[in-house]
């Protein structure tokens, strides 16, 4: 990766857009409020960078390293984050609407109150994430790993969670209306107060789960329809 001085970064960011920043090293850089919309940042090193309130809408961040970066209230609408590393990243209140995060790694990331509506998160590793009050409505989470994650009060309306790993996830008071949970693993998950109206739980594993009414799941029928 190409490492840059503070002056070089300042000079570069004031050039005509969109910028070509593939494989650039901006780790630890102070980039708050910066406009990097539509920029090419594939495989860039942005680890520990300060990107609070940054505009990264439509940016190409494929396989970029954003681990432990700060992206508070950043705009990442329509951004391409496929295979990106977002481990332990602060994504509080970030806008990831319609963004792509296929095979992304976001272990222990903070996505509290984030907008992930219609985002594509297929096979994303979001183990132990904070997603309380996040908007995941209509998101594609097929095969995603959300084990141990905090999804309390989250909006998962019409989300596709087919084959998702939700073991020990806290889904208390979450909206799972019309969600597709086919073949999902909800073992030991907490569903207290969750709304499962019209949710599809066919083939889902619920052993040890705490159900919306506070009871522990015991029966194992062949097919379950939320209601």
Task: Describe the role of every protein-language-model region.
Residues 3-227:
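Tandem repeat scaffolds
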């Amino acid at each position: 990766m190409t490492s840059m001085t503070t002056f070089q970064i300042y000079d570069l960011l004031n050039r005509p857009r969109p910028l070509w920043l593939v494989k650039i090293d901006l780790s630890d850089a102070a980039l708050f409020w910066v406009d990097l919309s539509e920029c090419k940042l594939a495989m860039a090193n942005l680890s520990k960078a300060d990107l609070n309130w940054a505009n990264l809408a439509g940016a190409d961040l494929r396989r970029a390293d954003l681990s432990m970066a700060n992206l508070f209230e950043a705009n990442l609408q329509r951004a391409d984050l496929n295979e990106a590393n977002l481990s332990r990243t602060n994504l509080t209140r970030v806008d990831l609407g319609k963004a792509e995060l296929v095979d992304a790694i976001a272990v222990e990331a903070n996505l509290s109150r984030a907008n992930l509506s219609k985002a594509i998160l297929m096979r994303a590793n979001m183990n132990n994430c904070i997603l309380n009050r996040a908007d995941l409505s209509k998101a594609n989470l097929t095969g995603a790993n959300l084990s141990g994650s905090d999804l309390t009060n989250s909006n998962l309306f019409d989300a596709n969670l087919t084959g998702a790993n939700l073991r020990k996830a806290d889904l208390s008071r979450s909206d799972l209306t019309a969600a597709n949970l086919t073949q999902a693993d909800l073992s030991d998950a907490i569903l207290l107060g969750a709304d499962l109206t019209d949710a599809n739980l066919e083939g889902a594993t619920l052993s040890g789960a705490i159900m919306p009414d506070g009871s522990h799941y015991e029966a194992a029928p062949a097919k379950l329809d939320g209601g």
